[in-house]
């Protein structure tokens, strides 16, 4: 294979979603929401990702005091090699979770955010197996203690994404695809928009054997 991404020949549209492998970064670098993944049906997604903070125990190894335990402290920014990325994490976080009330909680929430984002993409691509035959997230590990796209930090501590990956890459996996449309609410004293949603459960079975399973599904308050 000549390169990555590549459509299989020279420089002929190397990021062509219909041929070869693709790198996709509109989610994260392009600030697009996780739902953006569902607009695409790549043949093979060989690079995509989302950042998260390393374990608090790892952070404690490169910080000196409590003042450093802040996403925008001098030392924390020095351990973030993408400009303004800590703010980007916070921007995505406020769209997804209630804002954490402590730095350790913030660190953990950043890892859950990363895990949910990658899970959202992988589940979509696995639901479309046949069209999409692979998804490889960037990246596995780090070469120094840093806030990054990795699922294993520099000290070998697993982020939430690494635990999630064991589930969403399992040979037998169930996923839920919510479906719906936005409709206008005529009553001005109420919300202007409401979402009418339904759900579709999908089971991906790559064991090459028939499986008997029991599915339990429920709604709960966030």
Model-predicted segments: where are they?
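Intrinsically disordered, low-complexity Pro/Gly/Ser/Thr-rich segments with frequent PxxP/GP/PP motifs
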Residues: 213-222
